[in-house]
Amino acid sequence: MIKEELNLWAEGVEFRHLDAYYNFILSVLNFLCIKEYELSVILCNNEYIQKLNGEFRQKPEPTDVLSFNYFEGSEQINHKIQGDIVISLEYLEFSSLEFNVEMYEELQRNTIHGILHLIGYTHDTNDFQNETMLIIQERVLRETRRVF
């Protein structure tokens, strides 16, 4: 039986576009041919993600996105997802200014980034020209429709 379960919520932040964001995530999953998923996405503030980053990565500082993969056999690329993505909207406000992009584009980029990690992609650098995962990320961002 194929499971398709997607949950979204906001923790410590207000986000008024959950329906549009939900549809965006579904379009990314479809584009990446992910048919089986149990995925939760939490939109949060820096305090919330900093706590998780410290606890699970021993980096007590805020970050943009964290992915938690619960699927056994996650060492290789797999088109099934069982995991969580946590994204700090507060952090994205800063990074969108730094990269001179709209905040919602940065949210879409980080959502795709988290999904790619959950299906097994990794990257050693942030080189958008040479890292396979980041090249795929930008392609998915271009190809999926803008929803905000």
UniProtKB/Swiss-Prot annotation:
Disulfide-bond pairs as recorded: none
InterPro entries cross-referenced by the UniProt entry: MetalPrtase_cat_dom_sf_prd, YbeY, YbeY_CS
Subcellular location: Cytoplasm
One GO CC term, this protein: cytoplasm
Keyword Cell membrane: no
Broad class of enzyme this protein falls into: hydrolase
Cofactor binding notes: Binds 1 zinc ion.
UniProt keyword annotations, A-Z: Cytoplasm, Endonuclease, Hydrolase, Metal-binding, Nuclease, Ribosome biogenesis, rRNA processing, Zinc
GO function term, MF aspect, one: RNA endonuclease activity
One record GO biological process: rRNA processing
Stored Pfam families: YbeY
Binding site for Zn(2+): 113, 117, 123
HAMAP family: Endoribonucl_YbeY
Protein role: Single strand-specific metallo-endoribonuclease involved in late-stage 70S ribosome quality control and in maturation of the 3' terminus of the 16S rRNA.
PANTHER family reported for this sequence: ENDORIBONUCLEASE YBEY, CHLOROPLASTIC
Family per similarity comment: Belongs to the endoribonuclease YbeY family.
Name the UniProt record assigns to this protein: Endoribonuclease YbeY
